[in-house]
Amino acid sequence: MRFYTWKDIERYILMHHDEWKDELYDIEVYPNEMVVYPKSEQGTLQNAVLKKLFPKNITPDNLSIKLDGQGEDLMILYEYEYSPVTVRTLPLFKKAIYEDSIYPTEQLADLSCPVFAFHSYKGGVGRTLSLIAFARAWTNLQKNPENSKLLIIDSDLEAPGLTLIQGDLNDSAFSYLDLLTLIQDNSNVEEIVSTAGNLMGTITLPIETSQQRVEHFFLPTYRYEEQLFDLYASPQTITASRNKEYILAEVLSKLASSLGATAVLVDLRAGISEYSAPLLLDPRVKKYCVTSTSLQSVMGTKQVLSFIAKGLKIKEDTLLPTVFLGMIPETFPRREKQEIKENLLGCFET
């Protein structure tokens, strides 16, 4: 591997954690230096570890690492005083990529109201339409739809679709970004839900069936454009906060319950996005992954499913993701459909 910047070195160290964890407590990498925390003061051990990691780049005196193509060095410092840091499990792609399991060891609290998240690797494959179709089917199955409403959330912070479909939003509405700000600034779930419930506007998302039209609760991405372009809080910043790793699904669930809704439907941001990760990587959330038959869409969906499957203990009640394969040409061979199915299911083989 070639190391063009300090960030390449940091990623490489995280990728090869198993190769140095027995001799070193930690390695911290910065733009101009790398700090090594040896478990022993025997220089030969720590030098051997670094030479094994960077055989072509470490200098003969073991005091720096040469960056490829720049002629610059990254100085190595050795620190023998080390205070252990508690490792946190974060439902974010940038953390999950280096972990054997993306799920916490402790049992998470059950959600009071089910949360369904709709995701796609690529845009334009029918993710939002799948959510609407799901909402229509849900409404159609209820004996009394007016008493079985949904809380539908547009959480796409880069290309909000449902929000734009709704047209002009009045300033008295309440948005997903408003909710994220409340969560960022407060750790008390009950207070967050109470405030959000009081601020919820009158905006609804109408779902029509063959029998009736039901106005479901709707949380748009934003209520004025400046919210969208001048972000303060996001799912990523909230998740990185102390003791808020899995708060998002809990707040959405409890907010739905407080409104009298029976379930939450969330339209996620497409792609490998940290805006979507906290719900995609929460084992309590039911995921629907939407893909077309294109190779790019299928391979991207497989990448997402591989993240979801990392360390997932499959039990009878495990919420495995469901894949919606759409936009299938009439002439698409059955054999190729089967190959796509086997390719995606392979992510969860034990």
Question: What do the PLM-derived regions correspond to, one by one?
Answer:
Residues 1-96:
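Long, basic/Gly/Ser/Thr-rich N-terminal segments
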Residues 5, 44, 48-52, 246-349:
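Conserved catalytic-core segment of NTP-binding enzymes
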Residues 61, 205-218, 260, 316-319, ...:
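A short helix-to-beta-strand connector/capping loop
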Residues 89, 94, 126-127, 240-248, ...:
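Phosphate/oxyanion-binding active-site loops and adjacent basic polyanion-contact surfaces
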Residues 96-110:
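Pre-Walker A adenine-sensing motif
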Residues 108-164:
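Walker A/P-loop phosphate-binding motif and the immediately C-terminal alpha-helix
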Residues 116-118, 150-155, 218-220, 266-267, ...:
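Extended hydrophobic secondary-structure segments that form protein cores and membrane-embedded regions
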Residues 155-257:
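P-loop/Walker-type NTP enzyme "switch/lid" segment
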